[in-house]
Amino acid sequence: EYKEGSRKISAYYRETDPKKLAQLDTIFKQVMASLHWLEDYTGVSYPFAKYDFIILPGFQYGGMEHTGATLYNDNQMFLSEHPTPDEELRRTELIAHETAHMWFGDLVTMNWFDDVWTKEVFANYFAACISEPLYPDINHQLNRIKTFTASSLSEDRTPGTTSIRQPLDNLRNAGLIYGQIIYNKAPVMMIKLVELMGEDKFREGIREYLNTYAYSNATWNDLIRILDNKTAEDLAAFSDVWVNQKGMPTIRFTQKDGKLQICQEDPYHRGITWPQRFHVTLCGEQRDSILEVNLTDSLCTLPLPFPVRYILPNTDGRGYGLFIPDSHTLPWLLAHWQETADDTAREALLMLLYENYQAK
């Protein structure tokens, strides 16, 4: 049992190892920190009578967000005597994820299982917001592209890929819609949504959403309607492409007459474009430079500030899709990618090469 002010939390467990049980104080404090953060962010006090948790041996999931009795897997809560920073981060993220579900999934529940992904994308997004500042020495952008982007691309490149939101006519088939797209592409989309409208406006919308639909049901479109009123951006159009359509764009780069042309194509020929932002690194004889690209249409033309030898797409890993460099850059990149000093850029370029290989 752990008390902080008027709040009391109880833990139930089978573990008897004193060294592992000594971790309970850290676990309790992380639960409390997640509760405080979510209350402050949402403006909504913890919405249920209690927050107790049960640490189960051999539990098949990392956690399960039952109100008043959250379930956790013992191996993910009781760590080894000398855990790595990544193991500690995963535990913090798990606690934050399940705690976020108290607001997103329990306080407001999806109307039907075709929107089951919404509670997962909220939990993943807010778990990152809570956890990442606590581990400043970890490259979180690198982790995001290794986890979310790489995993979702592995499915999105295949003929069997699906949209994030999928129709479900019978509850017995609900298990079929879980996978890389729900758990990994949805967070990619959410990060882009927040980037598009701005963090402050997003937070305003989240507060209105929770207050409007507390202790009831809501759809993703209900949220988008609220968020759409907070910004001049067309979030309905953004959502239709990123949430309702399957697949990923093919983005080609060419250089001509001192200009960079970026062409976005839909492999399914539906005439849609995926709005997104990413960095392009320009490599010249004397210097390099980074361009911030805001891709909103099928064709984007940008002036090059100096003579450029190589154009490296998506070097910050924020972009999503199959990035095809110009014919001069691709063979050079294949021979020199490992020389890139920045870890995030090196991973993003390696993933670019891998996706180009898979597309052959």
Language-model regions, residue ranges each:
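Short loop/turn hinge sites at secondary-structure boundaries
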Residues: 1, 136, 297, 336-339, ...
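Non-catalytic architectural context of zinc metalloproteases
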Residues: 1-29, 309-312, 316-325, 336
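Hydrophobic alpha-helical and helix-loop surface patches within well-folded domains
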Residues: 5-6, 11-272, 353
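Low-complexity, intrinsically disordered regions enriched in charged/polar residues
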Residues: 158, 200, 217, 232-233, ...
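Long, ordered, helix-rich scaffold segments
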Residues: 180, 256, 270-272, 304-360
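Beta-strand-rich binding/interaction modules
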Residues: 235-236, 248-315
